[in-house]
């Protein structure tokens, strides 16, 4: 069980620390800081919605629904008899990522994103597109946790 809490705490601390660095050193609407060629950059953005900037309407609906989902996830893990390390790490990643983005939403009404993997940028069907959204550490933790959960579902949930 300690692994679950440790993983969630590590994600929260790393997420909030890197977002603070982005707020301090990257400016909104300015040039990206190129790290590797033109495909890995740091680009400051603020997201008031969920993944890919999708909106659920009122910010309060997003905060309440996220809180309920995270509370259910927390209770599920705490009361589960499953102590598989992969299970605990996976759910720790998801919980930590959800709390990390939740902190931003509660404090400022938006989530800071800054990691920009630009796989493709150009015209697609007559419109200018950047194929991959800008994201943050919390988003990465949630995505990795969800992917591992899907791939290893049978390993985590077989008796």
UniProtKB/Swiss-Prot annotation:
**This enzyme's EC code(s):** 3.4.23.36
Sequence intervals crossing the membrane: 59-79, 87-107, 131-151
One GO BP: proteolysis
Q: What class of enzyme is it?
A: hydrolase
Q: In which pathway does it act?
A: Protein modification; lipoprotein biosynthesis (signal peptide cleavage)
Q: How does it sit in the membrane?
A: Multi-pass membrane protein
Matching entries from InterPro entries are given as:
Peptidase_A8
**Which Pfam family, just one, is annotated for this protein?**
Peptidase_A8
- Catalysed conversion reaction: Release of signal peptides from bacterial membrane prolipoproteins. Hydrolyzes -Xaa-Yaa-Zaa-|-(S,diacylglyceryl)Cys-, in which Xaa is hydrophobic (preferably Leu), and Yaa (Ala or Ser) and Zaa (Gly or Ala) have small, neutral side chains
Q: Name one GO cellular component term.
A: plasma membrane
Any one GO MF term held by the record is: aspartic-type endopeptidase activity
Q: Which domain of life is it from?
A: Bacteria
Which UniProt keywords are given for this protein, alphabetically ordered?
Answer: Aspartyl protease, Cell inner membrane, Cell membrane, Hydrolase, Membrane, Protease, Transmembrane, Transmembrane helix
Q: Where in the cell is it found?
A: Cell inner membrane
Q: What is its main location?
A: membrane
Q: Which residues form the active site?
A: 113, 139
Q: Which family does it belong to?
A: Belongs to the peptidase A8 family.
Q: Which HAMAP family match?
A: LspA (MF_00161)
Q: What does this protein do?
A: This protein specifically catalyzes the removal of signal peptides from prolipoproteins.
Q: Which NCBIfam families match?
A: lspA (TIGR00077), PRK14787.1 (NF011368)
The protein here is known as: Lipoprotein signal peptidase
**Name of the gene:** lspA
């Amino acid at each position: 069980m300690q692994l679950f809490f440790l993983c969630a705490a590590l994600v929260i601390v790393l997420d909030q620390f890197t977002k603070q660095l982005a707020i301090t050193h990257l400016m909104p609407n300015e040039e990206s800081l190129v790290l590797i060629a033109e495909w890995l950059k740091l680009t400051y953005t603020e997201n008031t919605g969920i993944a890919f900037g999708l909106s659920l309407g009122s910010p309060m609906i997003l905060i309440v629904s996220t809180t309920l989902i995270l509370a259910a996830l927390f209770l599920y893990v705490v009361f589960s008899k499953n102590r598989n390390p992969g299970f605990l790490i996976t759910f720790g990643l998801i919980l930590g990522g959800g709390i990390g983005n939740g902190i931003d939403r509660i404090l400022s009404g938006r989530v800071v994103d800054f990691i920009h993997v630009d796989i493709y940028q150009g015209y697609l069907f007559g419109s200018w597109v950047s194929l991959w959204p800008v994201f943050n550490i919390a988003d990465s933790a949630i995505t990795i946790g969800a992917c591992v959960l899907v791939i290893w579902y049978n390993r985590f949930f077989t008796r």
